[in-house]
């Protein structure tokens, strides 16, 4: 049986880690390099950096952050946000990222997934999906631009398409659960896992260690993402893993 992963997520804006609720009301959390090294020592299995900077200067700062972090990090680092083309991917990998995460650019140019997978290997390519439940249409749809723009692309269709195009992993954020700390969107995640064979990282809703136990007991996703509950020290990676062990879940 594959051991499950616990992955802290750091949203980085203009060189600082920030966190909000449902992608809004951002507050400053701290220095990304310091936090990354803290989680490295705390037992995190991987790290995710999402660059949400609005300016070119902010994106340039992100390169410096990645380089400084990668020199001292001993766990895999996934980087996403603002990636538009193969040159951007090359730059990130050359500066220390182990994997890259594509979101809006993949929806706009699906062929980028195939090109990146063929050039760098599918193990490097994670497709991030900000999933929004449309009550009127009673279905989940992909959003872009940090969850601000709703598309007509069904999540259940898109996950299958990106796997065929060469994605090696999915990062699914349930927007209506994000930052709410009420638990993961179990039913949605379980359905996605039935449609694909690649690993899934679940994001959005993890409010305590028990939520991670429920996630792994009720779905076959590979990893759970956590942000504010770790940044605010409401729990720790070690506490989450201890609770998972108590629940009979294999951890690293």
Curated annotation (Swiss-Prot):
Protein's cellular compartments: Cytoplasm
A Pfam family recorded for this sequence: His_biosynth
Catalytic activity: 5-[(5-phospho-1-deoxy-D-ribulos-1-ylimino)methylamino]-1-(5-phospho-beta-D-ribosyl)imidazole-4-carboxamide + L-glutamine = D-erythro-1-(imidazol-4-yl)glycerol 3-phosphate + 5-amino-1-(5-phospho-beta-D-ribosyl)imidazole-4-carboxamide + L-glutamate + H(+)
GO biological process entries: L-histidine biosynthetic process
Keyword NADP: no
Gene Ontology cellular-component annotations: cytoplasm
EC code(s) of this entry: 4.3.2.10
Keywords recorded for this protein, A-Z: Amino-acid biosynthesis, Cytoplasm, Histidine biosynthesis, Lyase
SUPFAM superfamilies: Ribulose-phoshate binding barrel
Active site, renumbered: 11, 130
GO MF annotation terms: imidazoleglycerol-phosphate synthase activity; lyase activity
Pathway named in the protein's UniProt entry: Amino-acid biosynthesis; L-histidine biosynthesis; L-histidine from 5-phospho-alpha-D-ribose 1-diphosphate: step 5/9
Function: IGPS catalyzes the conversion of PRFAR and glutamine to IGP, AICAR and glutamate. The HisF subunit catalyzes the cyclization activity that produces IGP and AICAR from PRFAR using the ammonia provided by the HisH subunit.
Family designation: Belongs to the HisA/HisF family.
Complex formation: Heterodimer of HisH and HisF.
Protein name: Imidazole glycerol phosphate synthase subunit HisF
The species this protein was found in: Staphylococcus epidermidis (strain ATCC 12228 / FDA PCI 1200)
Gene: hisF
